[in-house]
Amino acid sequence: MRSDMIKKGDHQAPARSLLHATGALKSPTDMNKPFVAICNSYIDIVPGHVHLRELADIAKEAIREAGAIPFEFNTIGVDDGIAMGHIGMRYSLPSREIIADAAETVINAHWFDGVFYIPNCDKITPGMILAAMRTNVPAIFCSGGPMKAGLSAHGKALTLSSMFEAVGAFKEGSISKEEFLDMEQNACPTCGSCAGMFTANSMNCLMEVLGLTLPYNGTALAVSDQRREMIRQAAFKLVENIKNDLKPRDIVTREAIDDAFALDMAMGGSTNTVLHTLAIANEAGIDYDLERINAIAKRTPYLSKIAPSSSYSMHDVHEAGGVPAIINELMKKDGTLHPDRITVTGKTLRENNEGKEIKNFDVIHPLDAPYDAQGGLSILFGNIAPKGAVIKVGGVDPSIKTFTGKAICFNSHDEAVEAIDNRTVRAGHVVVIRYEGPKGGPGMPEMLAPTSSIVGRGLGKDVALITDGRFSGATRGIAVGHISPEAASGGPIALIEDGDEITIDLTNRTLNVNQPEDVLARRRESLTPFKAKVKTGYLARYTALVTSANTGGVMQVPENLI
């Protein structure tokens, strides 16, 4: 066992003394059992994580019952909804790297035999997956689960995205103060990750098809008995996998990454999943080309349209059969998935999900009646984004296949929000928000406030937004993000000027500014070099080391420094 490194031999008597002092070892024979880390992310200010202490206690009990010794540690967490629209959002994506580094540190410093990961929200889930790929110790994931959808006084289904869009609607005068306050009080009724197909739930669903969780991980409610039983069963399975030496990199292969993107397409997941899944591939040692994602989109039908793209919540998806029903449906179309891959259950993806039929065809469409024949995400290329950009086509009105408009440029999120709120932004505009990428932001903040304000003001079909920043999973509308290279790295988005004509072509997956190359070349000659906005602390180090969105926004040490 790995843990023998800290508990076997006379020279480790001091370490054994310290281990006895923890109270986790009930008898001398416990030294012969596997040591299992519980990597938790309990935190009081994140509603998706307030219940994770209870779930960790269930995991501990089950791990002991299975014949191993549990040791819990915690990571940090950032609530993107609370951190939105101010300096806190600069820390959201960078927190993913802190989580990965912290988990790696504890796991490797103490030579654990296996790890039980309990994530739930936004950057915590991918951060823990990065740690699992990096340490490659037998592991299993069981997230905290989604919250129930809210309900307004008028019986309207609510999610957090409803609340963000309500801000724009209230400013526009289209809803009353009473309606606004009612929504605020009822949009998030329970603990759990926000109820729609936002980043947290997107990643928790993708973990199912990656093979890192038990079935229904992505949709079973946080407050359900099923969630608690899932924790128990996952703990038993982890101890079994430790004995069988089944490791994360045995499970997360290139084919698994393909299948994660296929499920993402079928469910119209958050654009952030592209960023995180590319980072996971990078950590697993898999060289993954963005062009591959478009090929997957072309062969994968869009089967389940979930909030913010519809009124359906994650609980509705669960009641309709959950992720297993979607996987089962996709397996019926040859070449869409790689179903004979091994998963943490010890069974293949096919064995886990075969026969799990759709229970509600309104929520999950069958193969012969999809929302669209192609997936809900697209990678765009062109002279604005030579290394790619991402759009959630499932969140765009189906009538829009191309959009051409006049650029109105902003060098920060806050400038853009002010212009939208004071009606400087009008129908026919393409809002360009730049210097908000991983390096430029720094931290690649989410542009939920401007996109929500555009939709809330009734301009969702008349105004587009493009950015080297990213979006919340709650974003909908004509919103193109992750433009690479970013402006701070000299990307072409920095060369756009007010009034330039920009075309977003969803059919051909292109993003172009309609200016001759010689004009863009002259503009580049006069471009002012980017200077880092933050000079001290973690964000300064992050700015120095982070890569562009097309590589997952991971941190890499330059070769000349190694």
Swiss-Prot record:
| Alphabetical keyword list | 2Fe-2S, Amino-acid biosynthesis, Branched-chain amino acid biosynthesis, Iron, Iron-sulfur, Lyase, Magnesium, Metal-binding
Record bears the keyword Phosphoprotein: no
Q: State a single Pfam family of this protein.
A: ILVD_EDD_N
Q: What is the enzyme's class at the highest EC level?
A: lyase
Quaternary form?
Homodimer.
Q: What does this protein do?
A: Functions in the biosynthesis of branched-chain amino acids. Catalyzes the dehydration of (2R,3R)-2,3-dihydroxy-3-methylpentanoate (2,3-dihydroxy-3-methylvalerate) into 2-oxo-3-methylpentanoate (2-oxo-3-methylvalerate) and of (2R)-2,3-dihydroxy-3-methylbutanoate (2,3-dihydroxyisovalerate) into 2-oxo-3-methylbutanoate (2-oxoisovalerate), the penultimate precursor to L-isoleucine and L-valine, respectively.
Record protein name field: Dihydroxy-acid dehydratase
Q: Upper taxonomic classification of the species?
A: Bacteria, Bacillati, Bacillota, Bacilli, Bacillales
